[in-house]
C-alpha cells in the first residue's frame, strides 16, 4: 500500500510540479486547497490537481475561521511586526497548516508536504505548526530536499518538467512579482521590488486606489467592539450596516481599498536572517487596528495598556516567526483577553484619501472623566496635590545631579 501524503496545494507551478514529483516517488497524494479569501477558481484548481495525479482533493473554505479566530485574535494585541507590518501572510499560515494536519489525521496519512522555499518564512510557519499539533507526522519539504534541488535548479526546469508531464501551466510576464493574497491582504515581492531604491509603479497595486485618486469626500464609519472584538460596522453616510464577522471584514476591505487605505512599503527582517522588501495592501485591517487602538484609549487602565504595549512586539514576532501554537502564545493571549474585558464601545473614524482618523468614541466602561480632565472645572482634583507628586518624582533627579556635580569637582 502506498504511503499517503497531504500536500498544501495552490494550483501554481511549484505545487503542481511537487504533486507530480511525489506521485512519481510512489506516494498517494491528497491535495489540500485552502480558501482564505484569495481570488482563485477553486473548481479549476481541483480539476488540475486530479489531472496531475492527486487521488483526492480537499477544497476548504476557511475564510470565516480566518477572520474570527486569527485576524480578530491578532487584533487583541494590536499585532504589528517591526511596528509596521500587519502580518497578513503570517496570520493565515497556522490556520492553513492546522487544517492540513486535521486532514492528514482523518485520512491516516503519514506525511504532510508544502511548497514553501528554503529562504522564506513560510517553511518555518508550516513546519512549526505541524510539530506543535502532531509531532508524529513526517514532513516533506521539496525545496530543502537534495534530490528535488538537483532536478529543479530554477523556474526553467519546473516549466520544462510541467510541459513534459502534461501539467497545464500559465507563465505570464505581465506581473513579474511574487504575490500572496488572502482576505486580510495582498503582498507583492521580487522582480523590480528587490531593489529597495526602486519606486513601485502604480500597477503594482491591485486592491487599493492611489490615495491621490481616492474620492474627494470622506467616509464616516462607526465601528462597534465587544471585549476588543469587532461586532458591527455602520456607514454613517449611506446607512450600510454589517454584523456578520466575514461580511464586516469584507466591507471594511471594500471601503478601505476605494479610499486608498492600507498601503505599506518596507524592508523587514525575515526569521531566518535575510532582509526582504515587501509591498503590502491591507485596507480593512488597517481601519480596524486604528479604531481598536482608539477605543482602548478610553477603556484600558494606563498600566495595563502600557504593559500590554511592551508585550505587543513579542506577540507580533511570535506570529511572524510561526509560533502561533506555542505555550508562550497561550500565555500572551490569556493576558490580552483579560486586558480586553472592558474594550467595549464604538469608534467613529473618518476615512479620506489613504488616512483613517478617529473622530469620536464612546464606551459604557469609559475611564475618561470629563470633570477630572477639564481645564476649567476642578472636579474633585486638588491641584495642590501635584506639588508633592512632582517633588517625589524629582527627588532622584536632584540626587543624580548633585552626585554628578560632586564627581566633576
From Swiss-Prot:
It is found in: Cytoplasm. Its EC number is 6.3.4.5. Keywords: Amino-acid biosynthesis, Arginine biosynthesis, ATP-binding, Cytoplasm, Ligase, Nucleotide-binding. PROSITE patterns: ARGININOSUCCIN_SYN_1 (PS00564), ARGININOSUCCIN_SYN_2 (PS00565). It is an enzyme of class 6 (ligase). L-citrulline binds at residues 85, 121, 125, 178, 187, 268, 280. One of its GO terms (biological process) is argininosuccinate metabolic process. GO terms for molecular function: argininosuccinate synthase activity; ATP binding. L-aspartate binds at residues 117, 121-122. Pathway: Amino-acid biosynthesis; L-arginine biosynthesis; L-arginine from L-ornithine and carbamoyl phosphate: step 2/3. ATP binds at residues 8-16, 34, 115. It catalyses: L-citrulline + L-aspartate + ATP = 2-(N(omega)-L-arginino)succinate + AMP + diphosphate + H(+). It holds the Pfam family Arginosuc_syn_C. GO terms for cellular component: cytoplasm. Belongs to the argininosuccinate synthase family. Type 1 subfamily. Homotetramer. This is Argininosuccinate synthase. It comes from Thermotoga petrophila (strain ATCC BAA-488 / DSM 13995 / JCM 10881 / RKU-1). The gene is argG.
